[in-house]
Amino acid sequence: MKSKTLQRLLQTAKPEKTSLIWGFIFLVLSSGAGLTYPQLVRWMIDNVVQPKKLDLLLPTVGVLFLAFVIQGIFGSLRYYLFTLSGERIVLRLRKKLYEKILSQEVAFFDQWRTGDLMSRLASDCATLQNTVSVNISQGLRNLGQVLGGFGFMFYTSWRLSTLMFVLVPPIALGAFYFGKKIRKFSKQFQESLAEASIVAEETISGLRTVKSFVQESAETDRYGKTLEFSLIAAKSRTKSIADFMTLALIAGFGSVCFVLWYGGREVILSNLSMGDLTQFLLYLMIVAIGVGSLGSLWGDMMAGIGASQRVFEILERESLEKTEGIALKEILRSIDFKDVHFSYPTRTDYEVLKGISFSIVVGEAVAFVGPSGSGKTTLGYLLSRFYEPTSGEILIDGKKISDYALKSLREQIGIVSQEPILISDTIEENIRYARRDATDKEVHDAARAANAYDFIVNFPTGFKTRVGEKGIQLSGGQKQRVAIARALLKDPKILILDEATSNLDTASEHLVQEALQRLMKDRTTLIIAHRLATIKDANKIFVLNQGIISQQGTHDDLIRQTDQIYYQLVQRQFET
């Protein structure tokens, strides 16, 4: 594990210091109790069995049983403390990862696919959870038994122990060699699982498209192929673990055969008692079992290291968003775009905006129209600071928007988009999403103003009606009116309407348009739209084409320019 990753993991474990210290104490006590029974067996053979002292047999066995009881109690406490601490460590790690993902700039999500991020939150954290909560505890226990066993073996017979140490270098080299391979294959396995998660997430979220094109079989095959890649990595990882376990077990139990030969010879030559040989063999079995268990745990530990590297790759990434600045409490004068150029970070070779300049006076409703891909929606993204301009400036009351605290800037902006996204909760909580401390009355008033109250109360559970994933249980018009109610409750100074009525039928559009008029009152509004009903009353209209402003003026001014784009757009709408 890289030192920085280990340092971050230890830092996350710091609040569990007390539990981990007690867990370590119980680990030492349980391992110590487990290491006493070979001594007791030796004493029983040399002082009870061989001298045939029947009166001492039951008390000796009783003491042996007591040692096992003590080991069991301390072992249980050790497991409880280590496992619970590990669960809490990974819980904090998962929360930090989620918080870090949400803190990233919007451009980050253009580059990272949702399935990959979900895989790191779910699969990688689960692997790491198993490593931190169970494997480390078991690994420390086995390591303690191995080291303690070696110590008592030296105490029993230094000659036998010295000969046994010949086996240590090959096992250590094997652990290093196979550990490197296991870590590599584990990371490949996690990455291929992430790819499978991406495919599944894309397919399920776009299920209607999949079914409409009858692509269920093709998507199943695509998912199956990504799983095959993970199976190949899993096979390689499992083979490496199996090879290492084989090496460890052969070395461990091969040493038992060696001890039986050499130790038996020492007993015959009277250099070692039968009790000493039995004690040595029992310690050797403890060491062999410990080494074998460490072999299987080693693979899991390497998988955990691979998962932790993927988790900390996100945790160590600093967001490019500048969040600090002065508070934006009100807008007094204007919003100004000055020679703004912009390219999306994932398409730096294509310039979406090419020197855009305009000014919006506070309280005005300004519309932006133009062909698809002309950069209309991008203006709203830049004003909300989802992205930063490549060059040029965006000002509010003469100050760059980057000088304002990001939170306070976005608190002053309300967005109603073409396809509003609702959270999978109740209608009430979706409206209250704008302001968590809003009262029920404020929520209901916002719904009335958005022409949403009547359809909401007609549901059997009213405002407690669950909307489903992304609001799938509601119609397009209903979702839009809930989104408008949410924006009304937020009470922003700046409003961005991004094609807010383009997907609605005539009846729904009328209700939504009426609600939008209430929403726009006394607010500075940027309207991105095609429909004439939305833009004809705007104070000013800007026509965008290929990233530049080709026309500007009121509807009456622009409609008279019959050879220009605006006139053509309006005529095309009437034709349809």
Question: What name fits each language-model region?
Answer:
Residues M1-Y37, V49-V63, R78-G86, L93, ...:
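Membrane-integrated ABC transporters
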Residues K4-T5, A13, F82, K100-L147, ...:
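Juxtamembrane loop-to-helix connectors within ABC transporter transmembrane domains
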Residues P15, S19-G32, I70, V134-Q188, ...:
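Transmembrane helices of ABC transporter permease
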Residues V63-Q71, G75, V168-A175, I241-S255, ...:
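Hydrophobic alpha-helical segments in the permease module
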Residues E87, K95-S119, S123-C125, I198-R222, ...:
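Short intracellular "coupling" helices and adjacent cytoplasmic loop segments at the cytosolic face
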Residues V106-A107, S123-V132, I136, L140, ...:
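An intracellular "coupling" helix at the cytosolic face of ABC transporter transmembrane type-1 domains
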Residues S212-Q215, K239, V287-I314:
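Cytosolic ends of transmembrane helices, especially the final helix of ABC transmembrane type-1 domains
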Residues E330-T576:
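ABC-type nucleotide-binding domain
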